[in-house]
């Protein structure tokens, strides 16, 4: 079994409730879960666990178990099971199922003691009805010598005469019994025909009157099963799953909270109204508690809607998850809300118990009680992979297990799928299947809400049939919306044409409703400029011959179905626009209707265009050279700036050093003092003064030279450190970019940008180089940046034309201008 095919694996539905008296089974559907034959655990392997011992044997009345070892001629010598024989001699078991054709039943019997007693009673009654057979068998099985010594020839004659008389009586009784059975079968056939005419074929009519809520469920007592399916409060209000006898019992048990409510209390931001209200509430508390105490004896504390499943082993987890997510949780939460508001489940529980007290039949409960009807409709719809439209306390709850009929890639030839499925890689978010990734589901939902107005709706059935199936009045807004839909118009255009009658939000709601109910699917608006091809998933081996006659009857003036497909997908030519196969303008409407019919039944898909940005090797080399030239120019500019700053710093430091030296100040002061003293004292001191001046001037010169040399050394060291740091930073950036360029050049001849909307720095340089090389105009540059993030091979250009309101002519000009730098692919 493939996940592409619907397989609910739903066996039955149980509704378990728990009161202060204990858990009990309130309702089950189907009613004949006991008589259904499934591959249960063999009896010889059963009872190995302590919790399953009572399913095979009962500790009470162990003496009656000796009857199991009584030998009967009707027992199978290998298995020991009691067999019956039809008129043709074929064996059957006690429920009328052929043992040879149903080996599971004979080899996998897993019954209770009550069923064994019933089997023995039926066998005993059969032996009493035909005593001659068993007497004859007993006599024939005795020892021949003992018969010869104990009986003579006369006794043998009497036995033969007695056997002959008994055979005659048996033949008469057999004829009468066959006549009665024939009459009963005729009556049953008449009842079945009446039931089929009424549309109720869910229950076999041979045992309608014998169904009881106390019947065993797959060999288990209802009381024992209810104990398992009634978990404590700590395990309620969450997913509950238990496996018993290869059957999975799945549900969401709802338990009453300690404060008596069923739903979680919502946080309220209202301010308290004052002490008076609180005092009034305190006064009412005692009386309310007294009323609750008086009614809790028979009140409902827990209810559990249980879905019994038997999925394949390879799909067990997948089928259980989808059943819980789409059906079990939605239905249980709807019941919880109804119970919280109007005590819906509690009232239905009392009504069902009252009906059973009045000896109402189990098959008649769903005709008068809404809860029983809800469970029945849910089972009949979900088990047949249909949508369940349930009514819970006057409110509609819609449940369905999503069916995968939309594929974004072609399945393997060995993988089965639903006939008339279609391929579409652009609108996969409109499908409702297997979105286990929550984040992806949120993104898909956002995309759906934003983009659905850009698509058109293709109805999957005739409009009047949809109105009839969904019980919609033709004159209602929804009915008018369905009648006015056309697959060649997007919902945006539909809103603009019918703005007086429909709001955009209303149109979006109607569209989502039709998609959910599988009455329509979202497609690209049909256009004569688009290209359509035959679908590789077309059901050419199953439905082709039927559809050929249907297509010819529907469109008598159009080519036949095979010829139409041949025109769309010629064998030796590339597919052309749809306008090329329309003979004239008068045939336009009929050809569009035929195209819509072919798309609806999965014969045709639209061919879409996807684009990637391609960066050739020469453009990457050019960008690399430009980056190297920019780095070299930046380095020269930095060296020039640092050189000018170093020269200015050297001259200033020398002057400042000479002026601010403390030794220089001391020497100058001493020299001036001595000169003035010599002038005052006379000529005797002239020789000394000249000597002092010469000595002081030499010292001043040597001091200035030392200071200048020290300052120049400090400036040179600072300049070298700055230049080295800047050079290292520039070299690290250059090396990093060179590594990226080397990888891109070496890896491939051409590079494709996968996500242009999140391009790196280097990829942006490539994109800017494309714009400069192609010499795009300002208008084309604006269109280019508008479409840039969609050039990822995931979004078709046909969709961008509608969403971004770009004309086909402008798009054609842009693609022609950048044709050397794009890779285009055409597929579904």
From Swiss-Prot:
Disordered, as annotated region: 49-87, 127-207, 644-688
Keyword Manganese included in the entry's annotation: no
Signal peptide interval: 1-21
Compositionally biased tracts (Acidic residues): 60-79
One GO term describing the cellular component: GATOR1 complex
Compositionally biased region (Basic and acidic residues): 49-59, 139-151, 169-203
Bias (Basic residues) ranges: 127-136
InterPro entries listed in its UniProt record: HTH_NPRL3, Npr3
Extent of Polar residues compositional bias: 645-668, 675-684
Recorded superkingdom: Eukaryota
Biological process terms in GO annotation: cellular response to amino acid starvation; meiotic cell cycle; negative regulation of TORC1 signaling; positive regulation of autophagy; TORC1 signaling
Keyword line: Meiosis, Signal
Task of the protein: Mediates inactivation of the TORC1 complex in response to amino acid starvation. Required for meiotic nuclear division.
Family recorded in the similarity comment: Belongs to the NPR3 family.
Protein name, per record: Nitrogen permease regulator 3
């Amino acid at each position: 079994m493939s996940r592409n095919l619907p397989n609910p694996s739903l066996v039955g539905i149980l509704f378990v409730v728990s009161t202060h008296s204990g858990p009990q089974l309130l309702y089950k559907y189907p009613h004949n879960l006991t008589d259904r034959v499934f591959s249960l655990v063999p009896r010889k392997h059963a009872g190995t666990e302590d919790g399953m011992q009572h399913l095979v044997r009962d500790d009470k009345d162990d003496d009656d178990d000796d009857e199991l070892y009584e030998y009967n001629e009707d027992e199978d010598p290998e298995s020991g099971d009691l067999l019956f024989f039809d008129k043709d001699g074929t064996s059957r078991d006690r429920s009328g199922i052929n043992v040879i054709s149903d080996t599971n039943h004979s080899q996998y019997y897993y019954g209770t003691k009550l069923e064994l007693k019933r089997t023995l009673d039926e066998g005993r009654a059969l032996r009493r009805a035909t005593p001659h057979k068993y007497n004859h068998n007993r006599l024939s099985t005795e020892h021949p010598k003992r018969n010869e010594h104990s009986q003579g020839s006369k006794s043998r004659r009497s036995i033969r005469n007695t056997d002959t008389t008994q055979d005659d009586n048996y033949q008469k009784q057999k004829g009468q019994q066959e006549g009665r059975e024939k009459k009963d079968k005729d009556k049953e056939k008449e009842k079945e025909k009446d039931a089929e005419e009424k549309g109720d074929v869910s229950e076999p009519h041979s045992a309608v009157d014998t169904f009881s809520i106390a019947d065993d469920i797959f060999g288990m007592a209802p009381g024992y099963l209810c104990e398992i399916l009634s978990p404590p409060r700590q395990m309620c209000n969450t997913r509950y799953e238990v496996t018993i006898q290869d059957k999975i019992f799945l549900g969401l048990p709802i338990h009453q909270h300690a404060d008596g409510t069923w739903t979680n209390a919502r946080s309220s931001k209202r301010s308290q109204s004052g002490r008076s209200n609180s005092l009034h509430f305190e006064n009412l508390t005692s009386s309310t508690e007294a009323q609750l105490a008086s009614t809790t004896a028979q009140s409902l504390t827990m209810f559990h809607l249980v879905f019994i499943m038997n999925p394949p082993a390879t799909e067990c987890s997948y089928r259980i998850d989808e059943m819980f997510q789409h059906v079990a949780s939605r239905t249980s939460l709807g019941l919880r809300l109804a119970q919280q508001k109007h005590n819906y489940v509690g009232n239905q529980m009392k009504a069902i118990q009252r009906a059973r007290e009045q000896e109402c039949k189990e098959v008649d409960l769903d005709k008068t009680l809404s809860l029983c009807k809800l469970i029945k409709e849910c089972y009949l719809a979900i088990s047949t992979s249909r949508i369940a439209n349930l009514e819970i306390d006057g409110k509609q709850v819609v449940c369905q297990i999503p069916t995968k009929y939309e594929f974004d890639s072609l399945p393997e030839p060995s993988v089965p799928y639903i006939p008339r499925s279609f391929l579409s890689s652009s609108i996969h978010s409109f499908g409702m299947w297997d979105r286990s990734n929550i984040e992806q589901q949120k993104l898909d939902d956002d995309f759906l809400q934003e983009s659905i107005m850009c698509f058109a709706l293709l109805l999957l059935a005739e409009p009047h049939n949809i109105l009839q199936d969904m019980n919609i009045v033709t004159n209602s807004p929804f009915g008018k919306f369905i009648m006015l839909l056309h697959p060649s118009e997007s919902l945006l255009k539909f809103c603009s044409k019918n703005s007086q009658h429909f709001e955009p939000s209303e149109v979006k709601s109607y569209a989502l409703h039709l998609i959910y109910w599988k009455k329509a699917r979202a497609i690209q608006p049909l256009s004569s400029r688009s290209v359509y091809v035959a679908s590789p998933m077309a059901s050419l081996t199953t439905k082709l011959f039927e559809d050929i006659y249907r297509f010819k009857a529907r469109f008598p003036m159009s080519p036949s179905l095979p010829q139409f497909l041949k025109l769309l997908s010629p064998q030796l030519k590339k597919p052309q626009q749809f306008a090329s196969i329309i003979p004239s303008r008068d045939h336009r409407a009929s050809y569009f209707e035929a195209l819509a019919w072919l798309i609806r039944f999965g014969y045709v898909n639209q061919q879409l265009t996807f684009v990637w940005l391609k960066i050739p090797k020469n453009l990457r080399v050019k960008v690399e050279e430009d980056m190297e030239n920019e780095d070299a120019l930046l380095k020269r500019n930095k060296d020039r700036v640092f050189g000018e700053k170093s020269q200015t710093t050297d001259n200033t430091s020398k002057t400042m050093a000479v002026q601010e030296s403390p030794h220089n100040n001391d020497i100058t002061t001493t020299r001036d003092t001595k000169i003035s003293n010599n002038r005052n004292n006379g000529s005797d001191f002239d020789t000394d003064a000249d000597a002092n001046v010469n000595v002081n001037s030499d010292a001043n010169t040597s001091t200035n030279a030392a200071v200048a040399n020290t300052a120049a050394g400090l400036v040179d060291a600072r300049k070298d450190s700055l230049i080295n740091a800047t050079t290292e930073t520039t070299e690290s950036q250059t090396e990093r970019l060179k590594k990226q360029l080397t990888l891109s050049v070496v890896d491939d001849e051409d590079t494709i940008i996968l996500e242009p909307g999140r391009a790196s720095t280097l990829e942006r340089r490539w994109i800017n180089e494309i714009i400069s090389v192609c010499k795009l105009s300002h208008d084309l540059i604006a269109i280019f940046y508008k479409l840039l993030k969609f050039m990822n091979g995931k979004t078709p250009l046909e969709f961008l034309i509608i969403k971004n309101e770009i004309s086909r002519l402008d798009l054609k000009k842009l693609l022609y201008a950048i044709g050397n730098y794009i890779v285009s692919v055409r597929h579904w």
